[in-house]
Amino acid sequence: LTPLEGMKAEYLILNGAECEPYLTSDYRLMTEHAQEILIGGEMMRRVLGDVAGIIGIEENKPKAIEIMKKLTSNYLQWEVVPLKKRYPQGGEKQLIDAVLGRKVPSFSLPISTGAVVQNVGTAYAVYEAVQKHKPLITNVLTISSSDTSIQKNYRFRIGTPIREFLSAAGAMDKEGNLSRAFAKVV
């Protein structure tokens, strides 16, 4: 959160736009832990020097937008920006352009636009670390099959073997082989 010497942050953008079309882990965090995300975001915003806070969420997530708008309504420093559903909207440079209308120049860092971008999951992790004294040892992962018959979110410890992810999602057959729907994705 410390910008390079000579660069100053004007905005903290919390990225609530999933980077891939079938991911839903950020959406679930925003609908289930919105208050914690906002508290973690507020901590980061203040560390950056009381900059403006923006939460970018794709418009195909109306429940998350509604929840976050309701929460931020009491904070003058925060704004929720609904974003067009466009791949890869969750990319850092694309998000800055969509939210601020500023392009990150080639061979430059995002801070050159005055923006610091953090994921909503990072804001949640900051809350957990500072308020609950919990280290970041888990992450939420979406497991989705190509035919979308399986689409679930799981919280796993960092370093968990991929076979355990797939087994938990029901992607393995009785012999321990990957099911056909998942074989296309993995």
Residue ranges, per PLM feature:
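Hydrophobic alpha-helical positions that pack around
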Residues: 2-4, 50-162, 168-178
